[in-house]
Amino acid sequence: MSAPIPLHQPQSQQSASQQSASQAQPHPAQPHPAQGRPASPPQPSSPHAPHAAAPQPSAPPVPQQRTAQPSRQHRSDVVIVGAGVAGLTAARHLIAAGVSVTVLEAADRIGGRMATFDHHGFRLDHGAHLLNTSFPDLGDTLDLPRLELRALAPDVLVHRRGREYQVGAPSGPRPALTIGRAPIGSPWDRARLGAALARLAATPTAKLLARPELTSARALAERGIPARTLDGFVRPLLVALLGDPALGTSSRVADLALRGYARGRLCLPANGVSAVPLQLAESLPAGTVRLGVSVRSVSADGVDTERHGRFGCRAMVVATDARRAGELLPGLHQPDYHPVTTYYHAAGESPRPEPQLLLDADSRSPLSHALVLSEVDPSYAPGGAALIASTVLGRRDFGPDGPRALEPLVRRRLGQLYGVDSGGWEFLTVRHLPDALPAMPPPHHFRRPVRVLRGLYVCGDHRETSSAQGALASGHRAATAVLQDLGVIRASAAPELAA
């Protein structure tokens, strides 16, 4: 089991097209603390499901006014369309400054892609999420002790060409990296890698952004990293961190991601990633967020909805995913996406008795990485069972049966990687997210404008970096722009970048 992380908290008038503001995904609703009462995490309800059925929600309390009722006219200082992490972050900062806010969400739950569902007592995140203690906005925006972050092991387990080895630090954040039992180069190569990561951890952002910008793959090839070190550790680690199997991501983004890895610890909340949006929502006044409200069009002075009338405002923020934002704000930059497919299996006992990220460095394998979530925190699985999450990256032709068709191959590969008989494991479900991560090829604009025009704003990870840090930072930037234009605060310096 992973121990809690002892962390400190840092200081810290145009109409658009007639589309829905946020994609209502066919997934179970989560309790909505911003609308009446605190949410409770999913509770175990039964033994393992015998088949790969769709996850069912635990029975949440029904908050007061959980779903908006039809009405004709509403008004607040700011209307935010989308109750994902970016939108909730913007709402939190605006309300803290004394501005009245209404958040409209088309779905029946908050959180967007950062969702956790109960499946017969197993906590399944909506996709493979990893947080990092080095994310600056994580500590600036959230109450970290209440988030109950659980750290992954400081080292990673790598499989390549039939061999297994560990690479990592023995404890704590990485002032330097030590490597044991790892056939990734000579002792000199391993020392160079540890020194390089230590230097990277101390490198200022401005210096990283001054480097020539290439694709990650090309930059790695040109930096003189020994092939065994590159293929045996750096490449598979970056693939897992970026969700990009071809490493076409900007080399500057890759440098920031590696720096974050060297500085901090990969981690997850004890109650699943939905704990992040739930905590954000809990900080908002009751009634701030209205679920089940589909938006037809937006302008700087209001939002027109399908069934709930018009919401007037002095400023309007679109905080949906990039596709929906582009429908509401024609002409907005539209990124490509990296798909992420996550398979969930249950086992009677853990195949790895520690919360260690497993990297599959075999180019012929369908897998990128895997993690025993029940070792991160036992509450991820009921009754002492083990929960294993494994990730397949990239676009694939799964055939007429979809991602389930790949499950037998994934399970066999997991057995090989963990050195166990996985034939008796239960397949719980698979989550396929074709638009999981906005792509960040070079040249990548780290801070796309959040101000469309005075009174009209946009935020989301597609305006920053494709991570929880990007969503949090983008929401903060949008709120700052609104407050500046409303005359509440003066312009301030931009915070430090992180991937």
Regions found by a protein language model. Name each.
Residues 73-103:
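N-terminal Rossmann-like FAD-binding beta1-loop-alpha1 element of flavoenzymes
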Residues 138-140, 147-247, 262:
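Mobile amphipathic helical/loop "lid" adjacent to a hydrophobic cofactor/ligand pocket
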Residues 1-78, 96-97, 489:
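Extreme N-terminal leader/targeting segments of oxidoreductases
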Residues 3-8, 12, 63-71, 379-499:
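Conserved flavin/dinucleotide-binding core of flavoenzymes
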Residues 253-307, 311-315:
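Helical element adjacent to the flavin cofactor pocket in flavoenzyme catalytic cores
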Residues 95-119:
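Glycine-rich FAD pyrophosphate-binding loop
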Residues 130-136, 208-214, 218, 223, ...:
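Short beta-strand to alpha-helix junction loop
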Residues 2-6, 37, 296-404, 417, ...:
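Mid-domain catalytic core of redox enzymes
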